[in-house]
A protein has these predicted regions:
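Conserved pre-motif C helix in the palm subdomain of viral-like polymerases
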Residues: 1-30, 68, 167, 176, ...
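Basic, alpha-helical interaction scaffolds
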Residues: 115-189, 244-262
C-alpha cells in the first residue's frame, strides 16, 4: 500500500485470472453474428480493468448463455480461492440476460450473502462499470437522461453564482465542457440527441452570459477567432470529435480483437451508407478524414497563385514515437476546418427577412457582413483579454460584429414596437443602421465644436501618438547604450591598434535593433492631439519641411529628422470595416502628390526620404492588417509593444463606438475628453 510498484505488482498478479478463464473461452464466449467464413471467429468473453471484471457469454450447443455465465463465474471463484487473499464482493456483483432482445433474470447462483444469491439481477437499477452506466436492456436511455440532467445541472450551477458573465463562460468552457467530453467519449447516444437536447441549453446560457441578442446568430460564440468568433466548444461538434477519437483509438488498438470488432462495426456502417440512411456514421467520417490527411501529406502545401496574406494548411508531421497519435491530431485538425467551413456556408446561406429599413441590406445576408472584412485583424477575444474587461465590452463587440444591436433599422426588421420608422434618430432622414450611426451620419459629422465621429478618430490617434513618443524615447536610450564601433589596443612596444567591430557580432551580447528612429537624435513629432489627450487645433504641415496647403497636405501625425532628412507621416481612418480597403487606397491617392514632391526636392530644393503610413482601425475594432503591420515594423514597434498598441487602439475604437451607440438618440453632442487607452505599465 502506498508504494508506486504496488499497482504494477497487483496488475501482474490479477492478470492471471484471464489465463485461468481462457480455458473455457471457446465453450462459453459470446460470438458475434454474421461471421465471415475463412476468418477467425469473432467473440468476446472477459473484459476488465484493474480489479473490475465483466463476463459476456452466449449459447454453445445445448448449453445456454446463462448456464455458461454461471460456469465462468464458478471458475472465477476457484481462482479467488486459489489466491487466498482475494474474494468477490457479492453486493457489487450484478447480472442481466437478454432473451429475444428483452432483459430477463439469468438466476445465477454463485455467491450467497444474507439469504440472497449473487450476481443479482439488475432490474431497473443502474450499475456503473468503468465510468459507464449500465442498465438491464443495455440501451442508452439511462445515459441520455443522466447526461441531460448533468448538462442542465452544470448550467444552472454556474448561472446561479455571483460571477460576471465572462467568468461564467470561462468556467463553462474549461470545466463543464471538459467534464462532459468524457461522457461523450464513452456513451453511445446519437448526435441527434445532442443537437436537439443539449445544444439548445448551451446556446441559451452562453447567449445570456455574453449578452448576445436573442435573434443573433450564435455561431459567433463557436467560430474560430480568425473568423471573428470566440472559439468556444460547441456541444454537437465536441460530441462528434470525441466519437472520432474513440473510433480512431479502437481502429489503431494494439489488441487484435478490438481491431476486429471495429472492422466489423465499420462494415456494418458501410452497408447502411450504401443503403442511403441519413444518420451520422463515425466510421465513414473517420475514413474520409484519414484520406484527407494522407492526401495532404502527398500534395504538401501548395503556394502557386497564393496572394499576400495567404496561409496554407499546416501539414501533418507525425511524431516518431507515436504515429497513431500524430495521425489522430491531424485528423481532428482537418475535422475542425471542415466544421468551420460548414459554419461559414450556413451563415452565408441565411436569407434576410423583412429587411425594408435600408435597400442595401437586401443585397447581402444579415449576419455575415464581417465576411467582407478583407485582410482585417478582428478584435482579440482571447480569455486573457476578455476576463480583464466588463461584460458590456464583450456584449458590444459580439453584437456589433453580428450587427445585432438594437438600432432603429434593426428593430424595424424585428418588428419591434419601439422601432418607430427605423430612421436615424439625429434627424438626417437616412435609415438608422449601425453603420450609419457609427460612421455615416451627416448630422454627426457637422457637430461643433466636437463631433462624435472625430472624437473616436482622435482617441485612437492618441494611442498611436503615445506609442510613437514612447518608441522615440526608447531609441534615445538605446543610442546611449549602443555598442562602440571599434576597440583600441596598445601593444607591448607602445604601438596603438584600432580594431573595428564586425557588423554581425558573434558574441553572446544582444545588440539593440537599429530602426528608423535610431538613425538620428533630433526627431520631432507633430500630432493632432495633445500630450494630455486634449484636442488640438488643426496644425499645418511643418514649415521647415514644406509649406503646403489644400487637399493632401495635413496628415494626422508627422515625425521628421532634419539630420537624416527623413519624414514619416501617419494618416488614420476609422471607417466601417467593410469600407477599409477603399478608404486605404483613397488615402494613398490623397497624399501621393505630397510624397512625390518631397522625394523630388520640390520644396526648398531638399530631397527627403518619405515613409508614409495609412492605417485603418475599424469602428468595431478590426484592423486593416497590411498597413498596420507595415507601420509597426518600420517604426520598430514589435513584439510585446505591438500587441500593447494593437490592444490600445482596438480598445479606444470599441469604447468610443459603444458610447456613440449609447448616445444615438442624443441630438446634442457634449464635447468629451479623448479616451486614453495607452498605459505605460501595460
Amino acid at each position: 500500500q502506498g508504494c508506486t510498484v504496488s499497482t504494477i505488482l497487483f496488475n501482474a498478479a490479477f492478470n492471471t485470472v484471464f489465463e485461468h478463464l481462457s480455458v473455457i473461452e471457446d465453450d462459453c464466449a459470446y460470438q458475434f453474428r454474421n461471421q465471415k467464413p475463412g476468418k477467425p471467429i469473432l467473440q468476446v468473453f472477459v473484459t476488465g480493468y484493474a480489479d473490475d471484471l465483466g463476463i459476456v457469454t452466449g449459447r454453445h450447443g445445448e448449453n445456454g448463455a446463462f448456464h455458461n455465465n454461471e460456469k465462468a463465474l464458478k471458475r472465477l471463484q476457484e481462482w479467488l480461492a486459489w489466491t487466498r487473499s482475494m474474494k468477490a464482493k457479492p453486493k457489487k456483483c450484478i447480472a442481466s440476460g437478454l432473451l429475444n432482445g428483452k432483459p430477463v433474470d439469468p438466476e445465477l447462483k454463485v455467491w450467497e450473502s444474507q439469504g440472497t444469491w449473487y450476481p443479482k439481477f439488475l432490474e431497473d437499477e443502474v450499475f456503473k462499470f468503468l465510468g459507464k452506466g449500465l442498465v438491464a436492456d443495455a440501451s442508452s436511455t439511462q445515459s441520455k437522461e443522466m447526461i441531460l440532467a448533468t448538462f442542465e445541472k452544470y448550467a444552472k450551477l454556474i448561472d446561479g453564482t455571483f460571477l460576471t458573465g465572462v467568468e461564467k463562460m470561462w468556467i463553462w468552457e474549461h470545466f463543464a465542457m471538459t467534464k462532459m467530453s468524457w461522457s461523450f467519449l464513452i456513451h453511445d447516444f446519437p448526435p441527434s440527441f445532442v443537437e436537439k437536447e443539449l445544444q439548445p441549453i448551451e446556446t441559451r446560457y452562453l447567449k445570456k452570459w455574453s449578452g448576445l441578442a436573442k435573434r443573433a446568430d450564435p455561431s459567433v460564440l463557436y467560430r474560430s477567432k480568425k473568423n471573428a468568433g470566440m472559439g468556444l466548444k460547441e456541444a454537437t461538434v465536441e460530441h462528434k470529435r470525441q466519437r472520432l477519437i474513440r473510433r480512431h483509438q479502437l481502429a489503431t488498438s494494439k489488441d487484435p480483437r478490438v481491431r476486429a470488432i471495429h472492422d466489423q462495426f465499420a462494415e456494418l456502417q458501410l452497408g447502411r451508407h450504401k443503403q442511403g440512411t441519413n444518420e451520422w456514421k463515425e466510421c465513414m467520417e473517420m475514413e474520409k478524414l484519414r484520406a484527407e490527411v494522407k492526401t495532404g501529406k502527398i500534395v504538401g502545401a501548395p503556394s502557386e497563385g497564393a496572394g499576400i496574406g495567404f496561409r496554407g494548411r499546416r501539414r501533418c508531421r507525425p511524431k516518431a514515437l507515436d504515429k497513431h497519435k500524430a495521425e489522430r491530431e491531424e485528423m481532428l485538425r482537418v475535422f475542425s476546418e471542415i466544421i468551420e467551413q460548414e459554419r461559414l456556408v450556413k451563415i452565408m446561406s441565411k436569407p434576410l427577412v423583412a429587411s425594408d429599413a435600408h435597400p442595401f441590406e437586401k443585397e447581402g445576408n444579415y449576419f455575415c457582413g464581417w465576411l467582407k472584412w478583407e485582410a482585417a485583424q478582428a478584435v482579440d477575444l482571447s480569455w486573457g483579454r476578455v476576463l480583464q474587461k466588463q461584460d458590456a465590452f464583450l456584449k458590444f463587440v459580439l453584437n456589433s460584429t453580428q450587427d445585432s444591436l438594437p438600432t432603429p433599422s434593426r428593430l424595424k426588421n424585428w418588428a419591434q414596437a419601439r422601432a418607430s420608422d427605423g430612421k436615424c434618430p439625429l434627424g438626417c432622414g437616412q435609415p438608422g443602421t449601425l453603420m450609419h450611426i457609427l460612421c455615416g451620419c451627416v448630422k454627426a459629422h457637422q457637430e461643433t465644436p466636437q463631433n462624435r465621429i472625430k472624437w473616436r478618430h482622435d482617441s485612437i490617434l492618441l494611442a498611436i501618438y503615445r506609442a510613437v513618443q514612447s518608441r522615440i524615447d526608447e531609441s534615445k536610450e538605446v543610442e546611449k547604450d549602443a555598442v562602440p564601433q571599434a576597440s583600441q589596443f596598445r601593444s607591448s612596444l607602445g604601438k596603438q591598434f584600432t580594431v573595428p567591430h564586425p557588423e554581425k557580432d558573434c558574441s553572446d551580447r544582444l545588440t539593440p535593433l537599429r530602426g528608423v528612429f535610431e538613425k538620428a537624435d533630433d526627431w520631432k513629432v507633430q500630432f493632432d492631439v495633445g500630450v494630455e489627450g486634449e484636442l488640438v487645433a488643426e496644425r499645418p504641415f511643418p514649415s521647415e519641411i514644406a509649406i503646403v496647403s489644400g487637399r493632401g497636405s495635413r496628415p494626422d501625425g508627422v515625425m521628421w529628422s532634419m539630420k537624416t532628412k527623413t519624414v514619416i507621416w501617419i494618416e488614420l481612418t476609422s471607417p466601417w470595416e467593410e469600407n477599409m480597403k477603399s478608404q486605404h487606397f483613397a488615402k494613398c491617392e490623397k497624399y501621393n502628390q505630397l510624397a512625390t514632391d518631397l522625394r523630388g526636392g520640390k520644396h526648398f530644393g531638399v530631397k527627403w526620404t518619405v515613409l508614409p503610413h495609412y492605417v485603418e482601425i475599424g469602428a468595431r475594432g478590426a484592423i486593416q492588417e497590411l498597413g498596420w503591420v507595415r507601420m509597426c515594423t518600420q517604426l520598430g514597434i514589435t513584439g510585446a509593444a505591438r500587441r500593447k498598441l494593437t490592444h490600445s487602439v482596438q480598445d479606444a475604437a470599441i469604447y468610443c463606438s459603444h458610447y456613440i451607440f449609447l448616445c444615438r438618440f442624443h441630438r446634442q453632442w457634449e464635447p468629451q475628453r479623448l479616451i486614453d487607452t495607452w498605459r505605460k505599465d501595460a
